[in-house]
């Protein structure tokens, strides 16, 4: 019997050893694995202020006047205080101060969701664009939305307490003959991306800080990352103007009254031509 057992599998041997009244014991099937939980990023209990604060150094931001042509890749709307740009395209942001800040001053950029119901969520790239990251990203972690272009001194920070992402660069004074310092930012995910911003509006907060992290100045603007910045800017500005216009009065019910022909509204005043730059 021992020799025969060598030729049989252990499962068959166990079945032969069982009594006639015993039910056959089949090998136990492995328990099904529970599905892995979806990745959920922690919420932040810290919501940074977005209130404009020029501070002692008169800190403010400026933007180029790029117009609304189809070819533009980045354009700023002073009416909406909103930047429209394409994914990963250069977005020049000008920093202006009334007096030089102290040595060691830094400039921080951080994105937050604009609507209060989403403010505790950390703004990050969608999973697709995170996976598409390559060596050209340089120092930037793949999950960071905001990048600084052409600055090897940029630091990408993940706050251990608030979980928020930011990018910090040293403040550099304006060049001779210029009144502003320009930082070139990139936004690395579309506003419509599922799993990322998912059509939720965001604000970019730019802060001026001393070497210890103390606030010297703050400014912010809304950002929309889209395929056609010029078209989207025109559309949103038109919708904004329609909301601002007073509603026309309903016509009188009686048709007997004749309105005077001299009650025509005065012609709209011509707008002054805009300068080449906008400042906030």
UniProtKB/Swiss-Prot annotation:
InterPro entries: p53-like_TF_DNA-bd_sf, p53/RUNT-type_TF_DNA-bd_sf, p53_DNA-bd, p53_tumour_suppressor
Region of interest (Interaction with E4F1), ranges: 207-245
Marked site positions, Interaction with DNA: 70
Composition bias type Basic and acidic residues, residue spans: 234-246
Residues recorded as bearing N6-lactoyllysine in the entry: 70, 89
Binding site for Zn(2+): 126, 129, 189, 193
Positions of modified residues (Phosphothreonine): 235
Chain location of the short sequence motif Bipartite nuclear localization signal per the record: 256-272
Portion annotated as DNA-binding: 52-243
Biased composition (Polar residues): 257-268
UniProt keyword annotations, A-Z: Acetylation, Activator, Apoptosis, Biological rhythms, Cell cycle, Cytoplasm, Cytoskeleton, DNA-binding, Endoplasmic reticulum, Isopeptide bond, Metal-binding, Mitochondrion, Necrosis, Nucleus, Phosphoprotein, Repressor, Transcription, Transcription regulation, Tumor suppressor, Ubl conjugation, Zinc
Region entry Required for interaction with FBXO42, spans: 63-187
CDD domains, per the entry: P53
Family indicated by similarity: Belongs to the p53 family.
Known disease link: p53 is found in increased amounts in a wide variety of transformed cells. p53 is frequently mutated or inactivated in many types of cancer.
PANTHER family in the cross-refs: CELLULAR TUMOR ANTIGEN P53
Function: Multifunctional transcription factor that induces cell cycle arrest, DNA repair or apoptosis upon binding to its target DNA sequence. Acts as a tumor suppressor in many tumor types; induces growth arrest or apoptosis depending on the physiological circumstances and cell type. Negatively regulates cell division by controlling expression of a set of genes required for this process. One of the activated genes is an inhibitor of cyclin-dependent kinases. Apoptosis induction seems to be mediated either by stimulation of BAX and FAS antigen expression, or by repression of Bcl-2 expression.
Protein name (record): Cellular tumor antigen p53
Gene of this entry: TP53
């Amino acid at each position: 019997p021992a020799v025969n057992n060598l030729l049989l599998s252990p499962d068959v041997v166990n079945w032969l050893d069982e009594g006639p009244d015993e039910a056959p014991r089949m090998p136990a099937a492995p328990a099904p694995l529970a599905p892995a939980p979806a990745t959920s990023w922690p919420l932040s209990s810290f919501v940074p202020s977005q209130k404009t604060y020029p501070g002692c150094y008169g800190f403010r931001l400026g933007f180029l006047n790029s117009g609304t042509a189809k070819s533009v890749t980045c354009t700023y709307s002073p009416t909406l205080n909103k930047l429209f740009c394409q994914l990963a395209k250069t977005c020049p942001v000008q920093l202006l101060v009334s007096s030089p800040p102290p040595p060691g001053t830094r400039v921080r950029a951080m994105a937050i969701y604009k609507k209060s119901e989403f403010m505790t969520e950390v703004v990050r790239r969608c999973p697709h664009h995170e996976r598409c990251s390559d060596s050209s990203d340089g120092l930037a972690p793949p999950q960071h939305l905001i990048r600084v272009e052409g600055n090897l001194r940029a630091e990408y920070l993940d706050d251990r307490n608030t979980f928020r992402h930011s990018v910090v660069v040293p403040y550099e004074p304006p060049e001779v003959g210029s009144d502003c310092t320009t930082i070139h930012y990139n936004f690395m995910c579309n506003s419509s991306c599922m799993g990322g911003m998912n059509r939720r509006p965001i604000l970019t907060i730019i802060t001026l800080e001393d070497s210890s992290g103390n606030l010297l100045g703050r400014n912010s603007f809304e950002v929309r990352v889209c395929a056609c910045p010029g078209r989207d800017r025109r559309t949103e500005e038109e919708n904004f103007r329609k909301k601002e216009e007073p509603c026309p009065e309903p016509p009188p019910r009686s048709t007997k009254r004749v309105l005077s022909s001299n009650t025509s509204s005065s012609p709209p005043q011509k707008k002054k031509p805009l300068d080449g730059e906008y400042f906030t």
